[in-house]
Amino acid sequence: MSIDEAVARYRDVIGNLATGNLRRIVIQSEKLAQIIASSKGTVRFHHKTRSGKTVIYKCIKKALLSSVASLSSEFSSETDVQQFLHLNYIYQSHFQALSGQINKYCGMKKYYELKFAAIDYLETEVQTTGLTLSRFWVASLDEFIKKERWPDNGSNFQIFYKLMAEYSSWKWDSDDKRQLQFMYEFRMKLKECLVKFYENFDLQKSSDPLKELIIPWEKIVYVANCIDAFTGEQVRIDGAELIWTSKNLVFSSISSAVLRLNDLQNMFSAFRPYGEEALVQDFAHIRSLKWDSNDKVESLIRALIFNDMFPYFNKEQVDTKADGIFFLRLLRKNFKEHINDVKDFHIQVIKYLNSQFKNNYSTLMTSSKTQDRRKSHNMPSSILDDGNKIGMHVSPIDEYSHFIDNDEPLWRDKVYPKIYTNEQTPTPDASAIFDSHKIYAIISLLRYYLPEKRKFFRIYYLPSIFKRILYYGAKFAQLYFMEGCLERLVIESLQILEPSLVHAINNLIKSSIESLKNVTVTSDDKTSSGVIILSYKEFKSLSEVNKDFNEPFWPNQSIANSWPDFANKQLKRGQILQDAFAFHLFEIELPIIIDTTRNTHLKLVSNMCTTSILYLYNEVDSLSLTSIQEKLAVLPTSKRNEILLYNLNRLTKLKLLLLKENEKGQKFYAFNFKYKRDGQKTSLIRLI
């Protein structure tokens, strides 16, 4: 075979790289290459005289470039890194098939030239089409950050970037600056893609704003870390700067999303480099985790539902979400430190709780299948001989000392409610879950957002629940242990999480329920009475509540006689009773019919003084102030007179008594038999 025939045959064999059997091509072309390279003379090739090795190089280059051209026809504006790597893999298989011949006959310089021919072709020859390596890189990044799922494309980005680094090192071997410039372009595209994403982000169409804002940044950082740790950190900072400039958008855009601990961790990690204090202040302001004199506790509870329904942290959260937990602790600390008037805040919180518990107990009362209140209390009915008379049953509440309580834990066998961990998917609209999740926010409020919380429970909460126990009397136990009792759920949860906060409250409930099991009857054998006996030593703080009103006002002599009789009985048991008249409550049935079909009378629950005033109207319809003072044995200059005037004022505001003048200009208080209360839905009103 002549040299010219060998060259022609060699060219035809390797020309089939893209379509032929590579193994056969390698075997056939190797034999022909040996013939061409061993030629001692020159070889005529393309009208020029060349050496055998040069001819081999020219033939291989033409074949490989033909392969490149064929493969590049498959590139489009949607080609990404993965597709490019696949096509480059095909080219490299063609190159590797002839790499032995290239290395043997062409030298290392030509070897790398042909190895990177496909990349070089895209970098230099295809610029006019816009299908550049940078374009493929950007297309992949855009697709990666927009996908809902997080496919593991890290290896593709890493391989592509490494390939570009190898290419630039070969291409600009003696120009370090040009190498850095080429690679810098790919790194800059990471930030540019984020900028573009945030510029085009449509908040109105977002179903999960926090996730859709944070996750793309996390993905870009992930790609950067696939390049190297330094690039990863730099891009993390770049991304954080982008989000930081629009942090108000980030925080406000998730105003209707219930945040998970993982969400808080992501935000803290993102913004921490710019200062913890600035982050906490901005987040607290935008997310309403703040308090001033014009704020409402209801709004704070809603903010806690969105941001902090974490009554406790489990071990897994502590181990894996340390930054999120730390962020929450900073938010809680910041909230408490910025409350200027702690006393006012305590008052607002207890008012809110009283309102919530009152509504909840009312709902429980309505839903319960219990019948008449006195019947459910196992109390004898109060028989009214005259429909125009005021009847009553009384619940005097007394304290005593020198009594040892049982230290056994309260309800030790009860199964406590499961506490919410808030590691669910963020809820786009929390309105539907507001009521059902309110308890978790209340617990967080009481544990973490109350400055001087032990003082709050001692001074405000303990008297508050005591008044509820007094009001509901023997029925309190039934209501308290009903499945939907909000107050019980709160107390039991706190008993698990921070027992010392509610220790006194649990003892109060236990002692009160135990005492209320024993119902007594006054000396007239008509008025039933429930009595609560508490340890003076343990509950001394309660004696300070309403101490200015601790004066006895006996509605009648029968009830007045019952007190010393009861005190003497307790004395024989070694219990010395202390006066607690401010806590005595009476349920009064008034001569005001609110339902004629059932002959239902209006009832009033009130204190001793109010009861005694109204009881006077069993004899007359109107009384002057002087007459009231005389009948109740009240001196005009005494402390009792202040209490009397205070309660008369409350009755006139309620319009049960009407302040009038007679023809002589003398003022008197008339009972309002035509009393009507707008919005009154029950037969019972409270004036405590």
Curated annotation (Swiss-Prot):
The protein's matches in InterPro entries, at most eight in alphabetical order, are given as: Cullin_homology_sf (IPR036317)
Q: What is this protein called?
A: Uncharacterized protein YBR259W
Species of the source:
Saccharomyces cerevisiae (strain ATCC 204508 / S288c)
